Amino acid sequence: MSKCRKTPVQQLASPASFSPDILADIFELFAKNFSYGKPLNNEWQLPDPSEIFTCDHTELNAFLDLKNSLNEVKNLLSDKKLDEWHEHTAFTNKAGKIISHVRKSVNAELCTQAWCKFHEILCSFPLIPQEAFQNGKLNSLHLCEAPGAFIASLNHYLKSHRFPCHWSWVANTLNPYHEANDDLMMIMDDRLIANTLHWWYFGPDNTGDIMTLKFLTGLQNFISSMATVHLVTADGSFDCQGNPGEQEALVSSLHYCEVVTALTTLGNGGSFVLKMFTMFEHCSINLMYLLNCCFDQVHVFKPATSKAGNSEVYVVCLHYKGREAIHPLLSKMTLNFGTEMKRKALFPHHVIPDSFLKRHEECCVFFHKYQLETISENIRLFECMGKAEQEKLNNLRDCAIQYFMQKFQLKHLSRNNWLVKKSSIGCSTNTKWFGQRNKYFKTYNERKMLEALSWKDKVAKGYFNSWAEEHGVYHPGQSSILEGTASNLECHLWHILEGKKLPKVKCSPFCNGEILKTLNEAIEKSLGGAFNLDSKFRPKQQYSCSCHVFSEELIFSELCSLTECLQDEQVVVPSNQIKCLLVGFSTLRNIKMHIPLEVRLLESAELTTFSCSLLHDGDPTYQRLFLDCLLHSLRELHTGDVMILPVLSCFTRFMAGLIFVLHSCFRFITFVCPTSSDPLRTCAVLLCVGYQDLPNPVFRYLQSVNELLSTLLNSDSPQQVLQFVPMEVLLKGALLDFLWDLNAAIAKRHLHFIIQREREEIINSLQLQN
């Protein structure tokens, strides 16, 4: 059978072939829509700007009763194992088979639940203004968009229906590559982002956080080439599993900033789609009133492909009245932009008409009823599900697929019409990030108990044993070798990216997120976040990591072995003796073994004495020192030479960029870890074999980076250099794999030491008590 032959899509029965009760359930599933409708007396009007942000929030009993009754039912889920509950609700989800069917049958790009949800919205409401079709140009802005499924869905809709307009888009999300961003706040999937980076705006600080006024100003400049924005979407949220009952309040500031951004950027007559959750709180009531006053039509819609048991809804706003109509109010709203806006209510309670509150309550009751019924039914079926119920669910799921395809008339789209026709990146971080959040496999109650434990209790109970004890010796030359060939580095296309100084390194595209998170917790809880090794650790010499340390002899032996391998594959043997440049390792210079290398030392005592902290290799002082040593080293090297270079870690884009440069000018790079028994100091070295020369333009570019680093440090600037090699380059497969291996070895070695130290202190403490 030919590998190119496509798997046939399963032919499904038409909806008419299902029983009336199945059809009735599916009709209801696709009919969760509430339209506000405005009173004829036109009493829904915005208040005078002088009245906004003057009063405290006033919660209303009718809405609080709805919130409390919903949370009572949600609390019944607290003792359920999340993996078991998710597996159960995946089966009871009537729309659960739609996504995979759509992906196969119409060749949908980035076909996720969000893709299908947005397609339902596109096909249910006239989101795209007629003006866009008349002028032949559509501009859209997508806020909090990761991973990009709304964009992919819109592309499919436009291309498959052959709408006569040229489409331009700009997107924003929390930058998955920014080291100070918390992965709990992000969707760690960069399949689309990595291949379309030029269309993503991460703001002046490069974080992607929309909740700052500087971001809003920068975004307006970024989209200034668009004559008008016809459509804005905002799909923002973050992980609320630590406090699911307060999801609405936790995301209220984000919703406010999304709304203000949309009202500031959207053109007259445009459309806005906003993801919200429950709308019981006063802050949500205010936002809904604002939107009803700013748009001709407001609908609240729950797509069939949105899981029926959650609170998610989409507010669909049509025919924007324009910035001019609300200019005085909008100007004042931007002054309260940010995370602290919820301290005062947007509107005083008395300015919101009773007719709006009544209509809004009807909306909340409408969706509250459906959610309550779904959760209660899922609990009942979780405890006992018979064969008849399983068969009915299977029929419902099959009927939902057919109804979806028939109702929305989805069409096949060839890959030539995708946003990313062929990925230019061999391996984005997406494949590595999936499946790493093992906290999902605990019940809510278990997670809360774990959060309540002190750091020492967690160590004593062995919660981190797997990270510490799986840390074995990394043998260089066996698996982690980065092979390079002389290549033309297009550094004229690169640019230096500055941003706000990193307070700490919370995430990295070059490391397993769980390992980094655990290491940071260990440093923060055990060592106070940052420390001085001279004062804190030298008096406690009994604390040393028990794992094997590579001796100087083994390091040189490995280096010689790699050098010989390289010489064996070379046609022309270098006429001069190969030089080995040691950076910062004065002890290696006096090694008593015969090696066929001319050993030279580039002294840099500071480079090896940097210690592990919450900043890791994000410290600008360390980065400047490392780059300075690298530039001095490159001046000393000739073709075929080798180098031993100590490295603290490579979590940041800056350090990954330097490893990429090394990768391009050496035939082989591998690493050795650990090389030191000193606690939490630099414990890894790079073995760089077969120097191939660095082009002068690249060397000069690195010099300019170094000069900027020095300028920023000497002026005590709040900025630092975040990146100087494009992410598209850093995400290439071989380099990414190497960095993951290197960082895992370093992080686990530090974890091993910290946890071993804590265990010894716990044991000593218990012995003293006895």
UniProtKB/Swiss-Prot annotation:
Single Gene Ontology BP annotation: methylation
Outcome when changing residue 85 to A: Strongly reduces mRNA cap binding and catalytic activity of the enzyme
GO MF term set: mRNA (nucleoside-2'-O-)-methyltransferase activity
Pfam families xrefs: FtsJ (PF01728)
Highest taxon of source: Eukaryota
Enzymatic reactions: a 5'-end (N(7)-methyl 5'-triphosphoguanosine)-(2'-O-methyl-ribonucleoside)-(ribonucleotide) in mRNA + S-adenosyl-L-methionine = a 5'-end (N(7)-methyl 5'-triphosphoguanosine)-(2'-O-methyl-ribonucleoside)-(2'-O-methyl-ribonucleotide) in mRNA + S-adenosyl-L-homocysteine + H(+)
Compartment annotation: Nucleus; Cytoplasm
Alphabetical list of InterPro entries matching this protein: Adrift-typ_MeTrfase, mRNA_Cap_2O-Ribose_MeTrfase, RNA_MeTrfase_FtsJ_dom, SAM-dependent_MTases_sf
Keywords: Cytoplasm, Methyltransferase, mRNA capping, mRNA processing, Nucleus, S-adenosyl-L-methionine, Transferase
Catalytic machinery residues: 117, 235, 275
EC number: 2.1.1.296
Binding-site residues, S-adenosyl-L-methionine: 148, 167, 235
Predominant place of localization: nucleus
Matches recorded under SUPFAM superfamilies: S-adenosyl-L-methionine-dependent methyltransferases (SSF53335)
Residue stretches making up the Adrift-type SAM-dependent 2'-O-MTase domain: 109-322
Recorded GO CC terms: cytoplasm; nucleus
Function statement: S-adenosyl-L-methionine-dependent methyltransferase that mediates mRNA cap2 2'-O-ribose methylation to the 5'-cap structure of mRNAs. Methylates the ribose of the second nucleotide of a m(7)GpppG-capped mRNA and small nuclear RNA (snRNA) (cap0) to produce m(7)GpppRmpNm (cap2). Recognizes a guanosine cap on RNA independently of its N(7) methylation status. Display cap2 methylation on both cap0 and cap1. Displays a preference for cap1 RNAs.
Protein name stated in the entry: Cap-specific mRNA (nucleoside-2'-O-)-methyltransferase 2
The species this protein was found in: Homo sapiens (Human)
